[in-house]
Amino acid sequence: MADVSSRATPLASARREIVRVCRKLYERGLIAGQDGNVSVRVGPDRILVTPAGLSKADVKEGDLVEVALDGTRRRGQRSASSELAVHLVIYRARPDVGAVVHAHPPTATGFAVAGEPLPANALPELVYGVGPVALVPYETPGTEALARRFTPYLEGHDAWLMANHGAVTAGPTLLVAHQRMESVEHAARIILAARGVGQVQALPESSVRALDAARREHRIGGRAQSRRPLKPDG
């Protein structure tokens, strides 16, 4: 099991990173309006999360809210994100997770609205860099019931589509969680384009197994080992 303290980011660094990633999510069209939320583990039992009711394009370091894993606000003037429960259920179950990103990437969310999972065997980069993307059944956003929907899908997944809602990604660091969100949306665009041209061709099963094994072998709790992995670069 991963050491939770090894996934904690110093508070000052976490504040800067969250603001930077919020800007990127907005600028790249992965969120709009007051959509989305971002959090980072800053201690064994606490996280830093974006506030409710504020555009992520405008969020500042002082707007962020420090919350205990039991949901108690420890520091901050604003209310924590309405999707706090989803973040907390991931952190509690996954000590390897150091950051969580929730966004509404248009194409990936289109798959979620259609009730269509992303194929787990179509793109080497998705198999290796993200792994299988779970499709979580719909529940009202901002509720504990939605967080409970995640429970069967927490182990073995670092990315989730929420039916009729959006996407969530997790990683050992905010950089990785954000990259996974971009990868999920990029994969969704490619798969949609492929369906417009013809039929999505699955990778050979042997290739999927090899890529999945490489992802597992060269990552410890989601963190890449120092030796160079077998990584697709095409």
Predicted regions span which residues?
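Glycine-rich flexible loops
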Residues: 1-234
